[in-house]
Amino acid sequence: MRPSLRRPSAARGFAYKAAQSLTRPRMEEFVLVRHGESEGNIAFNRSVAGDHSLYSGAFLERHSSFWRLSDRGREQAAATGEWMRAHMDVNFDAHFSSEYLRAMETAALLELPSARWRPEVMLRERDWGEYDLASQEERRNAFEQYEARRRRESLFWAPPGGESLAQVVQRIDNVLLYCNRRFGGQRVIFVCHGELMWAFRLRLERFSGLVYREMQADPRPGERINNCQVITYSRRDPETGALENDFRFMRSLCPWDPSASYTGWRRLDRGSTL
């Protein structure tokens, strides 16, 4: 009798993957750091306040990957590195950074001991397509129909020519799968971008699109991802030292602004099985 060539059902397939994940190697812990304040952050924030003047001249002639840190951004990165060296184990087994200049500058300014940073294209900023160099005024006027869809579709919305946050989550899946296999039982640090960190949160904390929309509409101080926000996911219980199968423990803090931090570790009831 010839074996069946039928595919297993979706439910059965997911169950098989979940069973496999219980024995799959995983990192013990990983840390995410958002880059410091950049030229683009300044231009965007001023535009939100009604001043669109920075969206002109040489600023529009460069791709956003070439935006540098501002003076304040460099101070934020240096302060974050100082805090990390004083309050965390900074002896990581692998160091990854987005290829964007603002992330690589931030990584260098952390001054982590023996760090050998690897630029990684999968950690690039979310692709904003035609929105990339558009002021708030242009977004309201030229992209009015897309703004309406953005409010309605939340994380499933993609700017014209760009990525939805749901698509960024798929990139994060690849990063996690690779690093879990390559650095099983080890500690890894990633310096990247705010949208990437939201994608990590969506995957690791497994909150729904509805919850994400609520958090974006009225974010609590500890839920924001500020410049140089530091988010840690760990399988090791910070109180008992016991090692869990999944990433069950999370901490989010902003070294240069304590008001944007949680008061300690949180246990995730729906830790990732990646």
Report residues per predicted region.
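Acidic, low-complexity terminal tails and accessory targeting/binding regions
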Residues: 2-30, 39, 43, 126-138, ...
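Phosphate-handling substructures
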Residues: 39-68, 110-173, 218-226, 244-249, ...
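Glycine-rich phosphate-binding loop signature in dinucleotide/nucleotide-binding domains
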Residues: 87-91, 179-186
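Short, well-ordered beta-to-alpha junction loops that form the rim of enzyme active sites
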Residues: 35-36, 97-101, 122, 172, ...
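Hydrophobic mid-domain F-helix/FG-region of cytochrome P450s
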Residues: 106, 195-197
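Active-site-proximal alpha-helix that buttresses catalytic centers in soluble enzyme cores
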Residues: 22-115, 166-169
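Residues that mark the start of a beta-strand
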Residues: 29, 186-187
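Active-site catalytic microenvironments for nucleophilic, acid-base chemistry
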Residues: 83, 109-113, 178, 182, ...
